[in-house]
């Protein structure tokens, strides 16, 4: 089973059409990876599906980097 970091990066790569090798933990979805507002919504939905969690809108707005997504998933993933 992949760890959370690998799973988050795989989702980001699939959703944003970027190579996993180009995704760094500090990468900003918008500034570094070229996401627009629709991309970020779809990314949050994909993370919710992958990890079986719900991310409230006010929390989703705070997730702007790969590391923040990893941290959120780590803290909220259902075992």
Swiss-Prot record:
This protein's superkingdom? Bacteria
* Residue positions where O-(pantetheine 4'-phosphoryl)serine is found in the record: 37
How this protein is processed and modified after translation, per its record? 4'-phosphopantetheine is transferred from CoA to a specific serine of apo-ACP by AcpS. This modification is essential for activity because fatty acids are bound in thioester linkage to the sulfhydryl of the prosthetic group.
Entry GO MF terms: acyl binding; acyl carrier activity
| Stretches assigned to the Carrier domain | 2-77
Could you tell me where this protein is found in the cell? Cytoplasm
A single GO cellular-component term on record:
cytosol
User: Which pathway does it operate in?
Assistant: Lipid metabolism; fatty acid biosynthesis
Q: Which keywords, in A-to-Z order, does the entry hold?
A: Cytoplasm, Fatty acid biosynthesis, Fatty acid metabolism, Lipid biosynthesis, Lipid metabolism, Phosphopantetheine, Phosphoprotein
Which terms does the UniProt entry file under GO BP? Answer: lipid A biosynthetic process
Q: Which InterPro entries match?
A: ACP, ACP-like_sf, PP-bd_ACP, Ppantetheine_attach_site
| Protein family membership | Belongs to the acyl carrier protein (ACP) family.
* Record's function text: Carrier of the growing fatty acid chain in fatty acid biosynthesis.
- Name this polypeptide is given: Acyl carrier protein
Q: What is the lineage of its organism?
A: Bacteria, Pseudomonadati, Pseudomonadota, Betaproteobacteria, Burkholderiales
């Amino acid at each position: 089973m992949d760890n959370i970091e690998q799973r988050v990066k795989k989702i980001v790569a699939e959703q944003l059409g970027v190579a996993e090798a180009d995704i760094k933990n500090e990468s900003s979805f918008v500034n570094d990876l070229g996401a627009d507002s629709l991309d970020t919504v779809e990314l949050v939905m994909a993370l919710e599906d992958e990890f079986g969690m719900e991310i409230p809108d006010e929390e989703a707005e705070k997730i702007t980097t790969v590391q923040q997504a990893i941290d959120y998933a780590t803290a909220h993933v259902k075992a």
